[in-house]
Amino acid sequence: MEYRKIGDYTLSRFGLGTKRMPITDASRVDRLDREIAAEIANEAVNQGMNYFDTSYSNHKGEAESFLGDYHEAHSSDTCLIATSFFELVDPRYMYVFQKQLKKLRTDKIDFYSLEGVCDLNKMRDIDSGAVDFLFEQREAGHIGCLGFSSELSPDNLRDFIGRYPWDFVRMKVNYYDWFNKDGSARYDVANKFNLPIIAHAALRTGAASALKPEALSILKDANPDRSSVDWALRFVKSLDGIVSVTCNMHSVREVKENASVFNDTATLSPEELNVLEACAKAQREA
C-alpha cells in the first residue's frame, strides 16, 4: 500500500468509506451488522489501509459509533478517523461536534470536513459561524486536519480555498467527470494552491460497474482481464495530486479486490488514459 502525507499524518492512498456498511434489517439503515463491519475493517487494515471515512449521518449515526469502538480497540496509526459536518442535516455545529467526539470515543478527530459546500450555499457555513468554530477546534487540538467537501465550480473553489488555511479538500474525482465535465479544472485549482485532495465517488456511486454496452466494450477490447471498477480506481490512483481516495465497501471480498489496485505499482499509461476518454464519451453518448 502506498502512503501520502497531510500535515503530520501518514495516510493510505486507499481508504474505507462507511456509507454502505452491511445491515441486519433491510428496512433499517441504522441496524449495522457490527460483526461483518468489523471483518471489513479488519481486512482493510490487513490490506494496509488506515484511513476510515464516515459522517454524522452515515447509517443514522451508527457508523460513527462503530468506528469509535473500533478506533478505541486499535492504535491511532492503524485507524485514522475522518468525519464531517453537514448543516442541512443538523445546523447545531457545536452540539454536533461534541456529540461526534463522544461517539468516536476521542478528544481529537484526525480529519474533519464541512460537507456540501456548493455554489448555491458557499457562504452558509461561514455566515453561521461554523467555519470559525471548527478552526478554533483545530487550534485547540480537537481536530488534526480541517477541510471541506467541494461541489464548487472552479472559480468559486479558488475563492473558497483562499479564504482560510485549509488542510485538504474532498472532491469527486472519476474519469467520467474528468473527460466530460470540469473535474480536471477543479483538480487543477486545488493543485495550484498545493492543497491535498482526498477523492471520493471514483466509481460514480456505482455507475463504473454499470457501464452501457458500448462503453464497456471499449474497456474490454483494451484489456479483457481488467474490470471496470479496476479501471476507475486505477485512474484516480494515477493522479499524483490525489493523496487518498475513499470507497464505500460492504464486503470483505470487495475490500480485497479494490485494495489490490493500490497494492501494486502500476498506473495508467497515456494510451490507457485515451481508452478511458473514449469510454467516457461512449457512456455519455449511448
Predicted regions and their residues:
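N-terminal binding-site loop/beta-alpha segment at the start of enzyme catalytic domains
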Residues: M1-D77, F133
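Conserved, mostly hydrophobic/aromatic
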Residues: I6, L16, A44, F52, ...
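Acidic (Asp/Glu)-rich catalytic clusters
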Residues: G7-T10, N46, G68-T78, Q98-D107, ...
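Active-site mouth loops of central-metabolism enzymes
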Residues: R20-E35, A82-R92, M123, L216-R226
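Short, acidic/polar
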Residues: V29-A44, D90-R105, E151-F160, S228-F235
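A short, structured active-site edge motif that brings together acidic residues
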Residues: D77-V89, F111-V117
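Active-site groove signature of glycoside hydrolases
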Residues: L101-K122
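Beta/alpha (TIM)-barrel catalytic core signal, keyed to glycine-rich beta->alpha loops juxtaposed to Asp/Glu
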Residues: V117-A286
